[in-house]
Amino acid sequence: MIRLGRISYVNMAPVFYRLEAEVEEIQGVPTELNRRLLAGELDVAPISSIEYARNADRLRLLPRLCVSSEGAVDSIQLVSRKPLEHVRTVAVTPESATSVVLTKVLLPDADHVPLGEEADAKLLIGDAALKSAFEDPTPHYDLGRLWQERTGLPMVFAVWACPEPLQGGLAELEDALVASVRLARAEPERLAFEASDSYGYPAGFLARYFEKLRYSFGPRERAGLMTFLELAQEAGELDEVPELRFVREAVPA
């Protein structure tokens, strides 16, 4: 049975909405899934795009899936009372790798400290970022929006990676994941209400949130990913930009 990683945030609800596949589902925050995939404890998982790039010689990608946004994403936020041009320290979450590097790309002069320490701004991701937007009146800066304003491209936060040697059945699993996303898109109200019951956010809020998320790994997303990796390399966060290697040749999403 395929060991399938699942990010333990509400952003996975569309992907697992009606997943028709026999899998062992293993949940964790992004950095935990990164570690477990590279340790051989998972057969496929959505992992931080920067961690894929750092380990691309050991991994292959599902060609039709990612987690991205075209502009604002809501669940990746810099919270700061200071204007961004005046931010010199950022307290960063231990749960994300891509967002931390994206912060370095967007704010190259800011030093990073662990979340909880005194800083000009703090980086929140996932459900913590969504909750903060409800509860904290401090200005929030959406990293997906900031990225698009800088590059004009989508920001790919995660890719679906598989360690070599590859487990059998991955192409069929990708088909099932894509089918689940398509059904979720066709039933947005039901998706939002079910996710509201599971995660506690208002259904209307989740419906708007899910509209901002993208799961197809098309040409624009790949261009956005490669641009991010090139800028990460310039920032000293990546030794080299890898060629993308896939489980199989891409088919229309």
Segments the model singles out, each with a brief description of its role:
Residues 112-195:
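Pocket-lining segment of extracytoplasmic ligand-binding domains
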Residues 7-11, 29-31, 41-52, 58, ...:
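Beta->alpha turn/N-cap motifs
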Residues 1-20, 27, 73-120, 124-128, ...:
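Bilobed "Venus flytrap"/periplasmic-binding protein-like clamshell domains
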Residues 66-69, 119:
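Phosphate-rich cofactor/ligand-interacting catalytic cores and adjacent structured alpha/beta frameworks
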Residues 68-77, 135-164, 205, 209-212, ...:
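Periplasmic-binding protein-like
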Residues 37-38, 232:
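Hydrophobic residues within well-ordered alpha-helices
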Residues 167-231:
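Secondary-structure end/capping motifs
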